[in-house]
């Protein structure tokens, strides 16, 4: 599937790479299963870069619209689960 990750032009290269890493963890959860700790670690880093709820909703909404994968539901399941692997 071809699509672009949502970006903010104010991010540094490192921040952009870390945001993409979070979205890739979400993809992995849907496609093969993601390691719960890695997913939550990527989400925590994402929240350091995108602390506001409004921007988070905007970026995650754009990602879900293009990919059909829900970052919100993925993180929610990871938080509520005690399984080592998260599969959506």
Swiss-Prot record:
Q: State one Pfam family annotation.
A: UPF0223
**InterPro entries from the UniProt entry:** BH2638-like_sf, UPF0223
Q: Which SUPFAM superfamilies match?
A: BH2638-like
Write out the similarity annotation: Belongs to the UPF0223 family.
Which NCBIfam families does the protein's record reference? PRK04387.1 (NF003353)
- This one is known as UPF0223 protein YktA
Source organism of the structure: Bacillus subtilis (strain 168)
